[in-house]
Amino acid sequence: MVREEVAGSTQTLQWKCVESRVDSKRLYYGRFILSPLRKGQADTVGIALRRALLGEIEGTCITRAKFGSXPHEYSTIAGIEESVQEILLNLKEIVLRSNLYGVRDASICVKGPRYITAQDIILPPSVEIVDTXQPIANLTEPIDFCIDLQIKRDRGYQTELRKNYQDGSYPIXXVSMPVRNVNYSIFSCGNGNEKHEILFLEIWTNGSLTPKEALYEASRNLIDLFLPFLHAEEEGTSFEENKNRFTPPLFTFQKRLTNLKKNKKGIPLNCIFIDQLELTSRTYNCLKRANIHTLLDLLSKTEEDLMRIDSFRMEDRKHIWDTLEKHLPIDLLKNKLSF
């Protein structure tokens, strides 16, 4: 973090991208500014954004590989230049781009002699490779070589205890961190009592998303962290009240949605987009992946449809209903149903 004195003027708080470039397929760079900020605010925003960018952004990577016959990870396979461990390390470096949630299967099945690169990975439709030229192995003889892979979207470091996997399956200590580095610097501007600060933020990513996309996702995650405090203040509830709150059975959600559909006359549901419902980024992304874009799309789904969405949880179901009840001018209290 760097501080410098520069000349500047006070304006309404705003941000913009002042530099953006692609150094390689796996290295994107972006530089952003936010100004004007009061003294101390730039540090607050800079520290929070840096931590969110490095620790809260989700990435997709290969987490497991299964070989046909390999007694241990340090063994070699006839006709292959690399050892099993070297192949695992190469797979760890593969950069993937996707919006999937949960575990997906992929595979490699080729015949030598030839070089194996990331382009040879057979992926599910929702996943794409950022750099198809990334090396995996070199087959030196005319052998059939097949690997079963597992792909997962997560955040941070994924570590798993090493074991003697009898079936030839080995975990890969993947790093789901699309943001490679973040720097911020603070510049002071103005004179006398009118001093303000300008925050400069530099972001490097691995190509699976742009720095601008990473900044947007990190900001959404930070907002989601503070939403519970805002909701608690609006509802006027205490922690003791929340602790003793009763959680009813699943079927109440479906009853309430059914009732809402019956009372939707006069509301242009196809003109109300889920972007307007103040959903958390997690719930919002789940619905978007299921092609649910408007309130009409949402109300056309049954509870079973929603629960089949990848990574959709009971907490998301409750959050959706609470949001609908908050924003729609429909009195459902007469049903005496509550979450």
UniProtKB/Swiss-Prot annotation:
A cellular component annotation (GO) from this entry: mitochondrion
Pfam families in the record: RNA_pol_A_bac (PF01000), RNA_pol_A_CTD (PF03118), RNA_pol_L (PF01193)
GO biological process, one term: DNA-templated transcription
EC number: 2.7.7.6
Keywords for this protein: Chloroplast, DNA-directed RNA polymerase, Nucleotidyltransferase, Plastid, Transcription, Transferase
Residue numbers spanned by region Alpha C-terminal domain (alpha-CTD): 264-339
Subcellular compartments: Plastid, Chloroplast
Domain comment, as recorded: The N-terminal domain is essential for RNAP assembly and basal transcription, whereas the C-terminal domain is involved in interaction with transcriptional regulators and with upstream promoter elements.
Function in brief: DNA-dependent RNA polymerase catalyzes the transcription of DNA into RNA using the four ribonucleoside triphosphates as substrates.
Full protein name: DNA-directed RNA polymerase subunit alpha
Gene: rpoA
